Amino acid sequence: MGRSLKKGPYCDPKLLKKIEELNAKGEKRVIKTWSRRSTIFPQMVGHTIAVYDGRKHVPVYITEEMVGHKLGEFAPTRTFRGHGDHTERSTALK
């Protein structure tokens, strides 16, 4: 279920403040954030934001196609390592 249109998109105020400060200075540096729920705004395009995935910060370079999506969509929390292999024991039981 999406967010109500009358409320508008959400972005962490501290993150937005950091982005605006960097834009004013013209700097490009990695910004660490734990706010996976923040919506990507046009001001963020061109910046690299390190999004926390529960274990480490994953660097995400923001492009124009990402605007409107959430930061958490680009930092997966689960690592799929594949299903179990067939062993001698499992094939012998059949």
Swiss-Prot record:
Family classification: Belongs to the universal ribosomal protein uS19 family.
Swiss-Prot/TrEMBL keywords: Ribonucleoprotein, Ribosomal protein, RNA-binding, rRNA-binding
Name the record gives this protein: Small ribosomal subunit protein uS19
NCBIfam families: rpsS_bact
Protein's job: Protein S19 forms a complex with S13 that binds strongly to the 16S ribosomal RNA.
Gene Ontology, cellular component aspect: cytoplasm; small ribosomal subunit
Annotated gene: rpsS
Keyword field contains Cell inner membrane: no
GO molecular function, one term: rRNA binding
GO biological process: ribosomal small subunit assembly; translation
Organism: Carboxydothermus hydrogenoformans (strain ATCC BAA-161 / DSM 6008 / Z-2901)
PANTHER family for the chain: RIBOSOMAL PROTEIN S19P FAMILY MEMBER, SMALL RIBOSOMAL SUBUNIT PROTEIN US19M
